[in-house]
């Protein structure tokens, strides 16, 4: 249990460090950013497919955005402030394809984060995932763009 807390603390620290300054892409103002780290190799997880869905009024998931992580393990530009309205969103990270490309047979098909966004006004969300073949941890950093 203590090791899980330490792992989450380290992951949160990595997210805060990455938020401290702009990334190489200069897109630090995007309302939704995903960062994926490889816990086995101790490096950013590159070319990981990420799919974002928005929950519809009939409780189905509608595709919202998608992309792949960069050399820094980050994915920016998924949406704009105008499109990223209040609602329930699901971020799905394709862990299976990532590990298979490295010759590893993983347990999970994907890592999934479901969250309510912008219910307290516009916010910026960084969803971070720390991956290993048989587990994953996620955390989020939510900031007010006006602060």
UniProtKB/Swiss-Prot annotation:
Changing residue 67 to V: In AMYLD1; amyloid polyneuropathy with carpal tunnel syndrome. Pfam families: Transthyretin (PF00576). Detected in serum and cerebrospinal fluid (at protein level). Highly expressed in choroid plexus epithelial cells. Detected in retina pigment epithelium and liver. GO terms for biological process: negative regulation of glomerular filtration; phototransduction, visible light; purine nucleobase metabolic process; retinoid metabolic process. Changing residue 114 to A: In a patient with amyloidosis. Changing residue 74 to G: In AMYLD1; amyloid polyneuropathy. Changing residue 53 to L: In AMYLD1; amyloid polyneuropathy. Changing residue 44 to S: In AMYLD1; amyloid polyneuropathy. It is found in: Secreted; Cytoplasm. Coiled coil: none annotated. The modification Phosphoserine is found at residue 72. Changing residue 78 to H: In AMYLD1; amyloid polyneuropathy. Changing residue 91 to A: In AMYLD1; amyloid polyneuropathy. Disulfide bonds: none annotated. L-thyroxine binds at residues 35, 74, 137. Changing residue 70 to R: In AMYLD1; amyloid polyneuropathy. Changing residue 56 to P: In AMYLD1; amyloid polyneuropathy. The keyword Secreted applies. Belongs to the transthyretin family. Thyroid hormone-binding protein. Probably transports thyroxine from the bloodstream to the brain. PANTHER family: TRANSTHYRETIN, URICASE AND TRANSTHYRETIN-RELATED. It is linked to Amyloidosis, hereditary systemic 1: A form of hereditary systemic amyloidosis, a disorder characterized by amyloid deposition in multiple tissues resulting in a wide clinical spectrum. AMYLD1 is an autosomal dominant form due to transthyretin amyloid deposition. Protein fibrils can form in different tissues leading to amyloid polyneuropathies, amyloidotic cardiomyopathy, carpal tunnel syndrome, systemic senile amyloidosis. The disease includes leptomeningeal amyloidosis that is characterized by primary involvement of the central nervous system. Hyperthyroxinemia, dystransthyretinemic: A condition characterized by elevation of total and free thyroxine in healthy, euthyroid persons without detectable binding protein abnormalities. This is Transthyretin. It comes from Homo sapiens. The gene is TTR.
